[in-house]
Amino acid sequence: MEEKDKVVVEFNQDNLDRFLNEYYKTHRKGKKPIVESPMSRSLNKMLVITNRIVQNAHKQNMKAYTCFVVKDLGLENLGISSANLNVHFVFPTKIRHDLDNFLGGCKEQVDGFSEIGLIVDDDYSHIHTISSSAEYIKGETKMIFTFSNCKFDLEELKEVQAKEKIRKEKRDESMAEKKTVSKKK
């Protein structure tokens, strides 16, 4: 695999539309878009939702969108093991936006990057710095993640994915046991 100094992942209206198109081919009953914007949700919007089930649904939908974009770009299982990250926001209006709120909302995308193997893990030993920038372009909404000074480690990625698979199997097994116990009552 060719190593790159920079890896760029862009979330825009085009790839959001294609994701939703694919999603609704298999989920025909859905009426409301499961992801409303290529932009991350503001922390203010995330924290207002107190229902954990709704919060988790938002997180899972954004993770699915993130995985779609990464696969579309051919970057799955890239295994970035060391990098700096810049998140660039393009806002469609001149309404005031707090970057810290939007940067905090990027957690859902970064979790998706880990799950699909673009990055080995999202901890501080793999992502050393996170910075943000923004601009206004009338009518355009997008978010661009740029990983720079990248180092890659496919062996570490495989180890982390194997551990995560075991952890997921144990979690699923535990959930199945809890359902069985609750049905017996």
Language-model segments: residues:
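Catalytic phosphate/metal-binding cores of nucleic-acid and nucleotide-processing enzymes, i.e., regions
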Residues: M1-K185
